[in-house]
């Protein structure tokens, strides 16, 4: 029983790390999001600080700020067609935000700051549903803070980047098994909680402008290892038995890797009214070979759990049209490959390949202030899949079914310049 619970605890952290990457929230700027979240070659606001910091030096104004928030409304339905069992996630909203600022020191150097929440989400299933031994609910938040510098080496080429400081927290609850209860019939469950999980990384980028109508961009964001040390694991509603853990708390240490990302793309502006953008993004998911957890209780051995993820790509397309002096319209699309391989599809992160459809606009309130709005409809392809790494009494007990998922993301922001 204790070995089984260790595997379950390990699954908790595997799911948390997936939410920090595999279910990455692409909402780091309303203007970019409205164009399929393509932005590595687009210089139209301080959002460039996140997408390609080397482009900050091309902003025309002395000081530019972009800030906003997006609502994430997701829905997942699961069904076992053999048994007829059905479950659906509870409606909730995530609220990723961003704050970008760029300051032009002179014509050759700009400084910037980017504060974002690219990894943060939540899922809440119905209480004691068929997969409650894998997850009841999860909440994760991670904040990226990036001081940046952009240097123009010539009229056609610039570089940029800086360190990344990350801090976050995670809370996860699951039932201990498919059937275990205490003497009163309450399902035995485990809650894991940790705050202040942190570490550092870096980003580097360049922008090449061969002609004034075309910008080619490259951005690399490093792998970041989030170190959870002394986190709290709470065991609740366990029966009074020598074969099960006692109710109470223990500590744990774990390292949660966030994969590196590489983005390359371009923006083409044939005239003053139109702009077209394309980004290719590669996330290096193969860092998730396994995940190790060391427990504070000396009677509980360290566990190793294989994840076997694969690298995945995202293809982003966007367009912008300046309709009037005050209104700019945008639209886009992206295709997002899932890094999850067969046999590793868990309900903590129920995502398959996804298609994102986006639109939005900017309204110029005054010479200095603009309001930016975007909307994303994200639909994941229906999939029949299973999670095969759950163990009971040393035996694999696959959890399988059909998943249907989608998400709506309306967003609002402002751009201010001096």
Regions flagged by a language model, labelled:
Residues 16-20:
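Sec/Tat signal peptide C-region and signal peptidase I cleavage site
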Residues 24-39, 57-75:
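Transmembrane beta-strand segments of Gram-negative outer membrane beta-barrel proteins
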Residues 21-33, 61, 78-88, 93-418:
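Outer-membrane beta-barrel porins/channels
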Residues 14-15, 64, 384:
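Hydrophobic alpha-helical membrane context
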Residues 1-4:
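Positively charged n-region of N-terminal signal peptides that target proteins for export
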Residues 7-15:
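Bacterial N-terminal signal peptides
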Residues 40-62, 101-105, 153:
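Outer-membrane beta-barrel pore proteins
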Residues 38-40, 44-45, 85-89:
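Asp/Glu-centered strand-loop micro-motifs enriched in Gly/Pro and often flanked by an aromatic residue
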């Amino acid at each position: 029983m204790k070995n089984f619970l260790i595997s379950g605890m390990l699954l908790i952290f595997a799911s948390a790390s997936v939410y920090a990457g595999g279910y990455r929230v692409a909402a780091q700027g309303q203007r970019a999001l409205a164009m399929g979240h393509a932005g590595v070659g687009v210089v139209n606001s301080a959002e460039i600080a996140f997408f390609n910091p080397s482009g900050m030096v091309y902003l025309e104004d002395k000081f530019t700020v972009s800030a906003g928030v997006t609502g994430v409304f997701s829905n997942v339905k699961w069904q076992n067609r053999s048994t007829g069992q059905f479950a659906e996630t509870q409606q909730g909203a995530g609220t990723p935000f961003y704050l970008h600022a760029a300051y032009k020191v002179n014509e050759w150097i700009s400084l910037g700051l980017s504060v974002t929440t690219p990894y943060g989400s939540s899922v809440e299933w119905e209480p004691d549903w068929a997969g409650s031994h894998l997850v009841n609910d999860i909440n994760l938040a991670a904040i990226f803070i990036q001081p940046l510098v952009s240097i123009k080496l010539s009229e056609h080429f610039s570089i940029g980047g800086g360190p990344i400081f990350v801090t976050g927290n995670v809370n996860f609850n699951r039932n201990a098994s498919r059937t275990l209860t205490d003497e009163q019939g309450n399902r035995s469950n485990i809650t894991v909680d940790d705050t202040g999980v942190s570490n550092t990384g870096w980003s580097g980028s360049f922008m090449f402008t061969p002609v004034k109508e075309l910008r080619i961009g490259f951005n690399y964001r490093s792998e970041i290892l989030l170190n959870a040390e002394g986190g709290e694991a709470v065991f609740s509603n366990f029966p009074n038995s020598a074969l099960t853990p006692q109710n109470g708390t223990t500590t744990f240490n774990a390292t949660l890797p966030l994969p590196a990302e590489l983005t390359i793309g371009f923006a083409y502006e044939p005239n003053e009214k139109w702009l077209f953008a394309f980004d290719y993004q590669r996330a290096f998911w193969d860092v998730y070979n396994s995940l190790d957890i060391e427990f504070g209780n000396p009677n509980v051995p360290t566990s190793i759990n294989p994840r076997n993820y694969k690298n995945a790509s995202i293809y982003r397309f966007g367009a912008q049209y300046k309709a009037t002096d005050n209104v700019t319209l945008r639209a886009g699309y992206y295709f997002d490959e899932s890094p999850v391989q067969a046999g590793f599809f868990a309900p903590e992160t129920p995502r398959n390949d996804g298609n994102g459809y986006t639109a939005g606009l900017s309204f110029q309130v005054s010479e200095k202030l603009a309001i930016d709005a975007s909307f994303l409809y994200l639909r994941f392809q229906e999939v029949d899949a299973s999670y095969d790494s759950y163990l009971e009494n040393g035996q694999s007990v696959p959890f399988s079914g059909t998943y249907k998922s989608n998400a709506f993301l309306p967003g609002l922001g402002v751009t201010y310049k001096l």
